Amino acid sequence: MEYGHFNDAEREYVITNPRTPVKWVNYVGTLAFGGFIDHTGGSQLCKGDPALNRITKYVPQMPSSDFKGETAYARVRKPGSSAESAEIVSPYWVPCLGKYDSFECRVGMYYTRWITKMAGLTFDVLAFVPRGSSELVRRYRVTNSDNVPLAVDLVPVVEFSHFDALKQLTNADWVPQTMTSTGVSLKDGRTAIAAYAFMKRDFAVNVVVANRPALSYETDRKRFLGDNEYGTWREPLSLRNERLSSKDAVRGDTIAALQLDLGVIKPGETVSVITQLLQTGGISSVEGACGKWRTEAEVDAAFADLKAFWDRYLSVVKVETPDAAFNSMLNLHNPRQCYTTKTWSRYLSLYQLGYGSDRGIGYRDSSQDTMGVIAQIPDEARELMEKLLSVQSRDGSAYHQFNPLTMVAGRGDSMEYEDRPHYYSDDALWIVLAVSAYLKETGDYAFLDKTIPFYEKDKEDRPLESGTVWEHMARAVAFTHGNTGKHGLPLLGFADWNDTVNLPAGAESLFTANLYGWALAELSELCAFRGDAANKALFDGWYAEMKRRVNETAWDGEWFVRYFDDKGAPVGSSKNEFGKLWLNGQSWAVLSGFAFNGQTSGGRARAAMDAVKKHLATEKGIKLSWPGYNGFDPQKGGVTTYPPGAKENGGIFLHPNPWAIIAETMLGDGDQAFDYYTRINPAAKNDSVDEYECEPYCYAQNILSNEHPNFGLGRNSWLSGTSSWVYQASTKYILGIRPEHGGLRLDPCVPKSWDGFTVERVCRGATYRVSVKNPKGASKGIAKIVVDGKEIAGNLIPWFSDGTHTVEATLG
């Protein structure tokens, strides 16, 4: 079944059937104030911290038909008739679930718009968080599309969460005793609803207000639903009364409902209402907080400002290729998702629920996320990298995650196991790749000299030591160099990128070995550019040493092993019953360069990726490993808690798929690289969504593989490193436009069937208009480049500081 379609001209995905397999969401605002809105109007919002400053109550585990966080009701009747005779509908369809004539939910660039027709009315609702503000604005335009006058009340409703999101679910005594929701009469005659937990009354109050006076209001869920809450969200019994109670709630399950009398709307007439949900500093500041977003002009200006931001953001990379789904994702939806993962890390989504103050921002997650936004928002990327570097330990390792408000860091799940190491071996290395990408993109080499403290502090909370960004990077690789095991390979620690494989202390990681190799290569390249011969020699030596160890110890005959356990036995070997072959063991041996052994193609690199194609590749994506473990094994850890074919246990874990795509481009196989891309492109799944279920406009984290009965089912969309890496694989390796220290490298690897493509790329103050022709049906290899009318040698375009420059290239 088709649930919607892409409208690239408007930068929207248009949902036309509200009965999607799961909730499809869109993000609004930022971590400072924002969250997500689902396609039927529900919202999950917070200010600053979803764990400790939650605003709306949204429980994803409840059925899709349930009200979640926010909605609105329209009470429609003939003029002069009673409320009991009215038809009650929702512009969002949920929770009323009544008959509708048409439904559109337009998922845009950090806004969502609904255009629905029902009960003789056309609703046009726009929801977004204005840039720089701390309010969710919803503008309702209600048009009488019938041929008779209709009397209409609009009743927007918000259900509040306790600020402590976890306690909202786990403490049914303390939470309701602390909650208050009260009507506040404003000087201009409007009514605002102020809701708060008692202990936050003087510094964190949630407010719901409209731009017109309310006829009545409600603050208590029990009264609103009616009949001791045996009334339902589908048809609250209080809406059968002429007015709501206008009583305050001094405990219980608090809501805000405003009865807004739109009067009698004539045929063809439109009435507008603007509502806002915000958080202000205390009950005394409610009046002052309700002065904005009163007029259509204000909303229009704020919406234009939001769209202008996305105009700028999306203008940095614009592509046109023979593949429409590739164009749609790369020009619109993939960049938006990269922005979202950079903003939210893995903090708050339909699946990452944001409970518990120890989750916060992941070190490895956000290091990779920055790489997907450096081109568009380099200053914000740098700011995040500085925060990440500040939670690096003096020994070069990194804390696994941190709270962005308090900057308190933790070691993650490793602290739950007394007998396992309390660090993740890959964490600290990712920042080397991120900083290197930032330097190549911006040329901001002064960043290397910025002093940033390490995490450890004295009793007065002062840093024990600080170092330059360069010193932080050097310590990251030095930590790996100094922590190796029986085979001379990096110790696994509690885990590497694959959090769920938790082998006993002493295990070694081939993933970390290869990531270390890539990090060393980046540092060596940087040293060469800066003329630092001594450090270049050091890093080159470490690289050669690790490359030798990997090839001497980890080649299994047809592929590379993935781990060595604490006893020195291989994991990811043909000799194993389960987990014989692991994707990351192969792709990363190519990415690091370790698999080449002096060759640019073929050899172990080609053999390893051939094993991936033979054993791991499915038509819906590449599996993380094969075959899946069939039973819990405490020596392996969390990977064996999943059934075969799910998540890390032989599932199609999407994050590593772009690493395989990059590996294939490095081997020169553009057809295979793009084939792998297409298999996981959600836009290409639009016509098979009943199987896939997740949003077709963003990447999921995982898809159940062919080892699972529900092969093809996707989950955990939006907040996934898949987004950043697919974006990099697409722009830097398939299209082949890579910023380097000395210039802009043009090195495409595309399907042979493509006759060419164009890219407009903004970098370091200049615009490059790149046109690539492919007359001979090649995948890789530049035969000729002409820059501003002059042919250049090689494929490295020199940097320009300004202006627009034409680049004409021919493959062959």
Protein language model features and the residues they cover:
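Active-site acid/base region of carbohydrate-active enzymes
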Residues: L97-K99, T321-L332, D379, E383-S397, ...
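Non-catalytic C-terminal accessory modules of carbohydrate-active enzymes
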Residues: K47, A51-L121, K614-H615, P643-N649, ...
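Catalytic cores of carbohydrate-active enzymes
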Residues: V155-V157, N171-W174, Y399-Q401, L515-G637, ...
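Polysaccharide-binding surfaces and accessory modules of carbohydrate-active proteins
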Residues: P63, T112-W114, V125-L239, A289-V316
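Extended, loop-rich substrate-binding clefts of extracytoplasmic carbohydrate-active enzymes
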Residues: G80-E135, G231-L258, N331-P335, Y339
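Beta-strand-rich N-terminal accessory domains
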Residues: M1-K68, R190, F203, L278, ...
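Aromatic-rich carbohydrate-recognition surfaces in CAZymes
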Residues: I361-S366, T370-A381, M385-K486, S509-A513, ...
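Short Pro-Gly-centered flexible turn/kink motifs
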Residues: L31, L150, G263-G281, Y516-A519
